[in-house]
């Protein structure tokens, strides 16, 4: 995240930008190497193309968590290009629902939230750039298929939502589209059906190659059908991590409500405690958008954990220096998944699985587990939720800061620091070549904070994201300058190092990240050529 305030600018940051010629799309890395090898640095993506395109499908009106998720999304939408907000059906909102309200689509709820966004937009512009206009957002709201599942697709059944998806894919824009499926996927299925009906197989493959789909919970039978019919599609299916922003809920071994690591203190460890946190940081005194951010409560029943399952799927797009939509196994705020697709990872919903069995085999990227130590408690956590939980403290701080931006002047709010890697202040993920046994020296000393806050540095090895099974020692891991010691047995593997820069601020400690991907040469390589 690179946030440049519109009325206050850090002078050191300006000087750094000037001296670096606004390094975007490349970097010059000066590494101290103890052998004759000089490692070279290459950004994975140029900064101009690092902004992702995004279309969100959601069953608005099913329950209040959809409105929570989308209000939260709107205070982050300057970080990606939002090209569609499509109201769709799913398992819980469909014509067959018992409750009349849940039998029809509710795109008007998108408009309600955009109206709130419009009122706080002038203040948001004081804190960061690239906010879309409210009228533009209204123009990309539409309805998808009105019926449930793959049965409501086929010739002559196109919808405004399916046509919007095709129009986005037809744009002269080489960037892929991150499609968030926060309910059923039949509107996306209809778009693909319509395109296949009038195009060659090669053209269909080219269109499918532009899609990156994150399916939240497999909430209808269309996802498996799409993956079976279009086997080259890049499709992430999350049955667990998608719920890890505030959950997963349920009960632990002591029969208590279990919500993962508690970063909403001093409020109670419960869903109600989370909502007390939301009342403090979102719903009260944070402008028109916060005022319409609802509680996740069903009628007069129990309050459930905040934001349900639809926040994690889009949240990774906020950190371009950490998250790569083409690399599901690398991890980030949207979780971590298998590098290769796996066969028949079924929906978590028992009533959907029988339909999926009829179209099997199909292949998707499924979630994988991490091991992480909670820095607040020292508790070691392992499991499928951990690839999201490990970022939770930073994600919650980001939410606090951004809802503050809705009402506060620049000098009363906090803003994200800018992490620099060897002088490069872009948003790019970086790649290095190295040899086994190398010592690589990194420097984050050019990192800045727009508020002049003290910066705290952390360099760490994200073991699960790479292919080297051992540990990588980082000397000076809590300093601006650090040395990474590439193990002698790491030949032919990939190592992921994370630079995490956070500010010291009483409002909330915000973070910026840079991922450094080190490709280690094989020991038997006849000649090692650095990346040019």
Protein language model regions, located:
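N-terminal secretory signal peptides that target proteins for export/translocation
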Residues: 1-26
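Bacterial N-terminal signal peptides
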Residues: 29-40
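N-terminal acidic, glycine/proline-rich low-complexity segments
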Residues: 47-441, 447-454, 458-468, 483
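Solvent-exposed segments in extracellular or luminal domains encompassing
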Residues: 476-492
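Short, solvent-exposed loop/turn segments at the edges of extracellular beta-sandwich modules
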Residues: 502-509
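Extracellular and select intracellular beta-sandwich modules with Ser/Thr-enriched
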Residues: 509-516
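Extracellular interdomain linker/stem segments of modular secreted and single-pass surface proteins
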Residues: 519-527
């Amino acid at each position: 995240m690179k946030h440049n305030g519109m009325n206050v600018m850090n002078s050191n940051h300006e000087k750094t930008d000037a001296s670096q010629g606004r390094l975007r799309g490349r970097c010059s890395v000066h590494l101290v190497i103890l052998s004759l090898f000089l490692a070279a640095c290459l950004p994975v993506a140029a900064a101009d193309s690092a902004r992702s395109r995004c279309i969100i499908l959601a069953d608005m009106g099913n329950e209040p968590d959809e409105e929570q998720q989308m209000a939260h999304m709107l205070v982050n939408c300057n970080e990606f290009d939002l090209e569609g907000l499509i109201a769709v059906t799913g398992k819980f909102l469909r014509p067959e629902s018992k409750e009349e309200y849940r039998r029809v689509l509710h795109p008007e709820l998108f408009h309600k939230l955009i109206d709130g966004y419009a009122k706080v937009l002038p203040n948001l512009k004081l804190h960061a750039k690239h906010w879309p206009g409210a009228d533009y957002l209204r123009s990309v709201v539409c309805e998808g298929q009105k019926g449930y599942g793959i049965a409501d697709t086929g010739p002559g059944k196109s919808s405004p939502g399916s046509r919007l998806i095709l129009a986005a894919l037809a744009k002269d824009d080489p960037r892929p589209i991150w499609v968030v499926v926060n309910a059923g996927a039949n509107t996306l299925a209809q778009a693909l059906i319509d395109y296949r009906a009038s195009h060659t197989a090669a053209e269909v493959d080219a269109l499918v190659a532009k899609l990156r789909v994150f399916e939240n919970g497999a909430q209808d039978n269309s996802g498996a059908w799409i993956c079976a019919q279009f086997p080259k599609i890049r499709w992430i299916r999350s049955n667990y991590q998608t719920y890890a922003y505030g959950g997963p809920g349920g009960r632990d071994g002591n029969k208590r409500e279990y919500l993962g690591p508690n970063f909403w203190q001093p409020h109670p460890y419960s869903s109600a405690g989370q909502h007390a946190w939301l009342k403090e940081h979102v719903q009260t005194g944070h402008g028109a958008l916060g005022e319409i951010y609802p509680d996740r409560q069903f009628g007069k029943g129990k309050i459930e954990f905040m934001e349900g399952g639809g926040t994690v799927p889009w949240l990774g797009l906020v950190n371009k220096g950490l998250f790569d939509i083409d690399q599901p196994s690398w991890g980030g705020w949207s979780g971590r998944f298998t590098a290769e697709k796996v066969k028949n990872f079924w929906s978590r919903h028992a009533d959907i699985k029988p339909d999926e069995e009829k179209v099997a085999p199909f292949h998707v990227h499924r979630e994988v587990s991490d091991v992480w130590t909670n820095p607040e408690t020292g508790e070691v956590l392992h499991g499928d939720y951990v690839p999201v939980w490990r970022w939770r403290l930073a994600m919650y701080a980001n939410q606090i800061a951004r809802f503050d931006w809705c009402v506060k002047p620049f000098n009363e709010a906090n803003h994200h620091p800018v992490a620099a890697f060897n002088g490069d202040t872009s948003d790019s993920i970086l790649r290095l070549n190295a040899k086994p046994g190398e010592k690589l020296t990194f420097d984050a000393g050019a990192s800045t904070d727009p508020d002049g806050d003290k910066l705290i540095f952390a360099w760490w090895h994200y073991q699960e994201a790479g292919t080297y099974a051992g540990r990588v020692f980082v000397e000076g891991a809590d300093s601006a300058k650090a040395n990474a010691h590439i193990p002698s047995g790491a030949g032919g593997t990939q190592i992921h190092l994370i630079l995490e820069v956070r500010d010291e601020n009483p409002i909330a400690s915000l973070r910026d990240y840079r991922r450094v991907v080190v490709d280690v040469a094989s020991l038997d390589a006849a000649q090692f050529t650095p990346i040019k």
